Structure formats: structure tokens, C-alpha cells
């Protein structure tokens, strides 16, 4: 082999390696952040997000704090921005606590979306939303009403925290619906488990002991609902109606034993998948406007809605809400069809 030919081959090899390196660097990277890791609900959402990444050929990283805190999420957001991620999708533990970090990310060209739990709308582009507050708050009350069946009743609300965006919006709507449609229902207490399984169980048992004549616990939280069911079993209380939101895999034994007659949710795997599809569309095509539609493999078509569907006054170009197609009521008859 001549020296000239050797140099030519070496040069081509270097160029080839450089091209491969550029392609790797150019690949889209999307971060999908839950409120915390180790909870089945968020793990299922992460599975959907990573499934979408494989379908679209983009790199999706699922990671979150071990405890639900603003500081933990901010640290992750900053790390992902510094690592050059193109998009961040976060389930926010606070409506405003993440805003400085998210606004800095947007200023650096990172696409910012929320899923499950929103920030203030000016702190993100799109919110992948499981349902409007009126839809989900109404769903909670209707599930309880199907079991309470009396004009005068005592009801407790039990969920994650007094600051989390989504659950407080649902509960506000649920309480308004109770006042309007069930004026004889007394809301005796509203308590919180702070996304901790042990504390949630202790709190649920405390509610049932303090209000022995309680008719219903409404628990729109993936930790609070199974904790309420377990507390009822521990205390041998089979008279209280327990409704709320959690995943079918977590709630299956309580439904099969009859402790919980029905509960609700949405397909959180789909929610994770839709989130990544929307982020990918933004990275490839730019912003979307109200009324724009997007086809999601295995899900169907979703549409961009204005922020007003969530009760917000804020509207801007490249900003809105993508609602999931449907919500689900789980019971003994259909829970076997679901695995997440």
C-alpha cells in the first residue's frame, strides 16, 4: 500500500467517524421527568414515553427525584439542559416553583412541556393533560354518589399535598359540584399523604378512626387511594365508599376483594407516549397552534386546545393544552383488561 493511499484511507476513516459522531450528537434527546420515581403511576408514564422514543427514533431518558420536591426537579431540569437535551417534559410538583428553571431552559432553546401536573402556562409550551378539572372533579363526585345513595353524608378528601397543581384543581371542582348537586354532604376533612406510602396509610387510618361514621373517602392520588383501601381493610371498615385515582395494577387486589367498588384514571402509558410525540413534533416542525391535530401511533388523533379549557386566562402563540382522548372507570368487570 502506498503512503498516499494509506493517508487517503485514514482521512476517509476519520471523516466517517466524525460523521457518525455528528449524527449521534444530532439525535433528539428528550427528558421525561415524573414527580418522583418508584411509584407505579409514574413508571407507567415513563414506559409509554420510552415506547414512543423507540417508535420515533429519539432518545428518551426517564428520571426523577426520589422525593417530590421543587429542588429535586430543578436540579434534574438544569442537568438535562446542561447536557444538551432538546426537550424536557415534566410532571410539576408546584405550579410556580419550577418556573425560573424552565424559563431559563426555554431561553436556551429547549422545548418545555408538562404532563400530568402543570406549571403556570407561561412556564411551558404545551401541557399533556389527562382531563379538565371539571371532567376529573366531576368524575370523582359521580363515583362517590353511585355508592353513597343518600342526601346527607359525611365525606373526606385525601390526596398528596396542598400545593400540587392538578389534584387541587380537581378537588376544587369536586367540592363545587358537591355544594351544587349534593348540598346535604358534609366535607368533614381534607388531609394529605405527601406522596409517602407510610404516611399515607397512617393518615388514612387516622381519618377513619376520627370519623367513624364517614360515608366516603375521595382520594385522587396514586398513593392515597390504595392507602385508604388498605386502611379500611386494616380497620375492618366495610361501610365507607372509597373512590379516587390510581393505577389498575395497584388497585386490583382491593377491587377483587370488594374493598373498592370502582375507581378512575386515564391510560397513563398513553399519556407518556402522547407527550413524547408532541415534543418530537415540536422539534421537527416548530410550534403548533390551537386546533392543530397530531396522529399518535396506537392511540389515534389528538388536538391542541386553548389554555382556557383548564381555566387559565393566559394564551400565547405556541402554547396550549393537549387533552387525552378518554378517561376510564375501573371495576371488577373490566379491570382484568388493563395492565399498567
Swiss-Prot record:
Alphabetized NCBIfam families for the sequence: PRK15408.1 (NF011937)
Stated name of the protein: Autoinducer 2-binding protein LsrB
Task performed by this protein: Part of the ABC transporter complex LsrABCD involved in autoinducer 2 (AI-2) import. Binds AI-2 and delivers it to the LsrC and LsrD permeases.
Location (main, coarse): periplasm
GO cellular component: ATP-binding cassette (ABC) transporter complex; outer membrane-bounded periplasmic space
Quaternary structure note: The complex is composed of two ATP-binding proteins (LsrA), two transmembrane proteins (LsrC and LsrD) and a solute-binding protein (LsrB).
Pfam annotation, one family: Peripla_BP_4
Family assignment from sequence similarity: Belongs to the bacterial solute-binding protein 2 family.
Subcellular location: Periplasm
Keywords from the UniProt entry: Periplasm, Signal
A single GO BP: transmembrane transport
GO molecular function: carbohydrate binding
Domain of life: Bacteria
Signal sequence segment: 1-26
Amino acid at each position: 500500500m502506498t503512503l498516499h493511499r494509506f493517508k487517503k484511507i485514514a482521512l476517509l476513516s476519520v471523516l466517517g467517524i466524525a460523521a457518525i459522531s455528528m449524527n449521534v450528537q444530532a439525535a433528539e434527546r428528550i427528558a421525561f421527568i415524573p414527580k418522583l420515581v418508584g411509584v407505579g403511576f409514574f413508571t407507567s408514564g415513563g414506559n409509554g414515553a420510552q415506547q414512543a422514543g423507540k417508535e420515533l427514533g429519539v432518545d428518551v431518558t426517564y428520571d426523577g427525584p426520589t422525593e417530590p420536591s421543587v429542588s429535586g426537579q430543578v436540579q434534574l431540569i438544569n442537568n438535562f439542559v446542561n447536557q444538551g437535551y432538546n426537550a424536557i417534559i415534566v410532571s410539576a410538583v408546584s405550579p410556580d416553583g419550577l418556573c425560573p428553571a424552565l424559563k431559563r431552559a426555554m431561553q436556551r432553546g429547549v422545548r418545555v412541556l408538562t404532563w400530568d401536573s402543570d406549571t403556570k402556562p407561561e412556564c411551558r409550551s404545551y401541557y399533556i393533560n389527562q382531563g379538565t378539572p371539571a371532567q376529573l372533579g366531576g368524575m370523582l363526585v359521580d363515583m362517590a354518589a353511585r355508592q353513597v345513595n343518600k342526601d346527607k353524608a359525611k365525606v373526606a378528601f385525601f390526596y398528596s399535598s396542598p400545593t400540587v397543581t392538578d389534584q387541587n384543581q380537581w378537588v376544587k371542582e369536586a367540592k363545587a359540584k358537591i355544594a351544587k348537586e349534593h348540598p346535604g354532604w358534609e366535607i368533614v376533612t381534607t388531609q394529605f399523604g405527601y406522596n409517602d406510602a407510610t404516611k399515607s396509610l397512617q393518615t388514612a387510618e387516622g381519618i377513619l378512626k376520627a370519623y367513624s361514621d364517614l360515608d366516603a373517602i375521595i382520594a385522587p392520588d396514586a398513593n392515597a387511594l390504595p392507602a385508604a383501601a388498605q386502611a379500611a381493610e386494616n380497620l375492618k371498615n366495610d361501610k365507607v365508599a372509597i373512590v379516587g385515582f390510581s393505577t389498575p395494577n395497584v388497585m386490583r387486589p382491593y377491587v377483587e376483594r370488594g374493598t373498592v367498588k370502582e375507581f378512575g384514571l386515564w391510560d397513563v402509558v398513553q399519556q407518556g407516549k402522547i407527550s413524547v410525540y408532541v415534543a418530537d413534533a415540536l422539534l421537527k416542525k416548530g410550534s403548533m397552534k390551537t386546533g392543530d391535530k397530531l396522529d399518535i401511533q396506537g392511540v389515534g388523533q389528538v388536538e391542541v386546545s386553548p389554555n382556557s379549557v383548564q381555566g387559565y386566562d393566559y394564551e400565547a402563540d405556541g402554547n396550549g393544552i393537549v387533552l387525552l382522548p378518554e378517561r376510564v372507570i375501573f371495576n371488577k368487570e373490566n379491570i382484568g383488561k388493563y395492565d399498567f
